[in-house]
Structures are given as structure tokens and as C-alpha cells.
């Protein structure tokens, strides 16, 4: 009976808890996807804007001839000054840019704040990263100005078209870390960005920068998306991976957003519901067991009283706890026993009176007989 009553409640409770957990997980996953798309969109806006602005600076016939100049005449000097002015204006008006430099191996051009002559680029990190590509994004090692602490800087590297086989020119644009942070960090989620699926170039926790990003087991590179639980730092977290293909380059940005509290909240809610279900099952069960034991005790008491009455023992209990059908039955039994007891008492009283009457009659007969006997006869 208990199992029959509890089993439906148990099934409904388990189904409800599973449904609530599924809905909460789907809701958090939806929020995580939205935040991942927001971060990817912000990163795309920054990188696309920087790349498009560099197009405006470089896509001109002046750059073709300027960096191929064999001498510094007045015309070349004017072009060089105009380009330097354009670079300075762009640097001052673009908050996302931390530095902008053009490196060339043309010795005929004068050095300026943003244009530098360099005889060889082979050993430079940015040149190694560019390789044979015309443009690429890279995470380059930089140092703070005062204490010389190292940090990684997201950098656009572009090869500049030069109308000469002897000379080369390259544009290097470093992005400002604070600007990137202000655009990306707009929620409580932890954000991590990897360039081409290798080292982390940006992270909410700066300790992770430079380390390899952790991917799920099914990660195979290129365009990748995943939303769900994953172990991060020896803890299960709700994560979202989204891939951003950079504008006019072959780079892929892998954006990972992590909600550190989602699974904790879900598990806590499920635990509360499980506790409620256990209480909903346990409290009625305890009450039913107590009531059943109480009811069984009263049944046993009533049965014992009826059994004693059936054997002619009418000395049963006077009180019977409760106010239900069993109490009414006991009252009826008590009335019946009392009635039988009264009848028996009346019967025995009648028998006694009858016996007393017989005794009285016998005494009278004896007295009459005694009065008829001659005393002299008795004497003789």
C-alpha cells in the first residue's frame, strides 16, 4: 500500500526535477551562446576596423613608389611626410591602436616616429610570424615601458606592395589591451581567445595568456562550435566555443566564454528540489507508518477486548483512545458487555432470591413438622 502510494509521486518528482534541470541548462546554454557571439562580434568589429583603416593608409600608388625610391628627393620627402602625418593622425584618433609602425629596408628613407629603416627583418618575431603571407594576425611579446614586464599584444602584420624587387616594407599595428578588454568584458563570464587554436592571446585571467587553450575531445580545428559542460581547471564549467574568421586573412580566432556559476546554480537548484521530493515522500511515509502502528495497536486492543468478552470475561478496559469508527465499535462493545453483565447480575440475583425462597420454605416446613411432634414421645 505504501509503495503503491509513493511510487507515482516518486516518478512524477524525478521527471519534474529532470525537466527543470534540462530547461535551466538550455537557458544557461542559450545565454552562453549569446555572450560568445557578442564577444566574437566585438572582436570582429575591432579587427575589421583596424584592417580596413590600414587599407586606406596603404592602398595608394604613393606607397608603391615611396618605398621603392632610390633617392630622397623633394617629392619623395613630401610623400614620406604626408604618410607620417597620416599614420600619426590615425594613431591619435583610433583608441584601439596601441602602436603603428612601418618597417622598410630601403636606406634612402629617413626614420620618423612611425616609419623605421631596418636592414634585416629575419630575426624579428613579427617577420617570422608573417612568413610568405600578405597579412596575418599575431600575438607578439611586448614589454611595459616602466618596469619592463612582458605581455602579449594582438598585432596586425601586413606586407606593403613595393614597386621594387630590392626593397620591402611592412605595416605592424598593435592593438591596445585596455580597449579590447573594455569591448569584450561586459558580463560576469570568463572570456578566453586563442589565435589559430594555439596559444591564448587574451583572457580575463591574465595568467592564462600564452598557455594552450583547452578544447573538447571532438575539436578538429577550423570552424568549431560547442556549448555544454567541460572540465576547466579541475572543475566542471558551462562553456561555449565559437570561431571567428578574420577579415581578409587566414587567421581563426577561437572564442571561449565560461560561466563559472551556471552548473553550481543548476546543481544547487536540483539539490533543493531533491530535498523537497525526499521530504514530500519521507514525511507522509513517517506519518503513515506512525498512524498504521497507532491504528494496529487500537485494532489489537479492540480485538483483545472482544476476545475476552467472548470468553465471558467482561472486565475489559474502560477507555479507548480516538474518535472514529473503532471508538464507536468499542462503545457498542462496551454497552453490549455492560448489558450482558447486568443481565448476568440480574440472573444471579434471581437465582439467589429463588434459593433464599426455597430455603425459607424448607425452614418453614421444618418448623411445622417440629411443632407436630409430641415432646413426651421424644423424651421416651
Annotate the PLM regions.
Residues 77, 81, 89-175, 180-183:
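Extracytoplasmic/periplasmic ligand-binding sensor regions of membrane-associated signaling proteins
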Residues 1-22, 26:
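Extreme N-terminal signal-anchor transmembrane helix of membrane signaling/transducer proteins, especially
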Residues 331-371:
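Conserved signal-transmission helix
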Residues 13, 17-18, 276-296, 310, ...:
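Cytosolic-side ends of inner-membrane transmembrane helices, especially those
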Residues 127-162, 213-251:
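Membrane-proximal, non-catalytic sensory/regulatory domains of signal-transducing membrane proteins
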Residues 155, 167-177, 234-271, 275:
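Short, hydrophobic beta-strand elements of compact beta-sandwich sensory domains
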Residues 287, 291-321, 330, 334-337:
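Membrane-proximal alpha-helical signal-transduction linkers
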Residues 33, 48-82, 100-116:
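Extracellular/periplasmic ligand-binding regions of membrane signal-transduction receptors
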Amino acid at each position: 500500500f505504501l509503495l503503491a502510494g509513493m511510487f507515482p509521486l516518486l516518478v512524477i518528482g524525478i521527471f519534474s526535477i529532470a525537466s527543470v534541470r534540462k530547461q535551466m541548462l538550455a537557458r544557461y546554454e542559450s545565454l552562453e551562446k549569446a555572450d560568445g557571439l557578442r564577444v566574437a562580434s566585438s572582436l570582429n568589429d575591432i579587427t575589421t576596423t583596424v584592417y580596413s583603416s590600414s587599407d586606406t593608409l596603404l592602398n595608394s600608388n604613393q606607397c608603391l613608389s615611396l618605398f621603392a625610391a632610390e633617392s630622397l628627393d623633394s617629392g619623395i620627402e613630401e610623400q614620406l611626410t604626408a604618410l607620417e602625418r597620416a599614420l600619426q593622425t590615425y594613431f591619435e584618433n583610433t583608441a584601439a591602436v596601441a602602436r603603428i609602425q612601418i618597417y622598410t629596408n630601403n636606406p634612402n628613407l629617413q626614420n620618423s616616429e612611425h616609419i623605421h629603416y631596418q636592414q634585416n627583418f629575419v630575426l624579428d618575431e613579427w617577420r617570422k610570424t608573417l612568413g610568405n603571407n600578405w597579412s596575418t594576425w599575431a600575438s607578439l611579446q611586448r614589454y611595459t615601458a616602466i618596469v619592463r614586464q612582458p605581455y602579449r599584444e594582438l598585432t596586425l602584420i601586413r606586407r606593403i606592395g613595393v614597386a621594387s624587387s630590392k626593397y620591402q616594407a611592412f605595416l605592424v599595428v598593435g592593438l591596445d589591451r585596455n580597449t579590447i578588454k573594455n569591448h569584450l568584458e561586459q558580463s560576469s563570464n570568463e572570456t578566453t581567445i586563442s589565435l589559430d587554436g594555439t596559444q591564448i592571446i587574451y583572457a580575463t585571467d591574465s595568467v592564462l595568456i600564452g598557455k594552450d587553450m583547452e578544447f573538447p575531445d571532438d575539436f578538429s580545428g577550423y570552424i568549431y562550435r560547442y556549448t555544454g559542460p567541460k572540465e576547466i581547471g579541475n572543475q566542471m564549467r558551462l562553456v561555449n566555443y565559437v570561431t571567428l574568421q578574420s577579415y581578409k586573412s587566414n587567421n581563426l580566432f577561437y572564442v571561449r566564454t565560461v560561466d563559472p556559476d551556471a552548473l553550481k546554480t543548476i546543481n544547487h537548484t536540483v539539490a533543493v528540489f531533491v530535498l523537497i521530493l525526499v521530504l514530500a515522500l519521507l514525511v507522509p511515509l513517517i506519518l503513515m507508518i506512525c498512524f498504521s502502528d497507532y491504528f494496529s495497536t487500537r485494532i489489537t486492543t479492540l480485538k483483545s477486548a472482544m476476545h475476552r468478552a467472548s470468553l465471558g470475561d467482561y472486565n475489559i478496559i474502560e477507555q479507548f483512545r480516538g474518535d472514529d469508527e473503532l471508538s464507536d465499535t468499542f462503545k457498542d462493545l462496551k454497552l453490549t458487555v455492560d448489558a450482558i453483565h447486568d443481565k448476568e447480575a440480574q440472573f444471579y440475583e434471581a437465582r439467589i432470591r429463588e434459593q433464599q425462597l426455597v430455603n425459607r420454605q424448607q425452614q418453614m416446613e421444618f418448623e411445622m413438622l417440629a411443632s407436630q411432634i409430641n415432646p413426651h414421645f421424644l423424651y421416651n
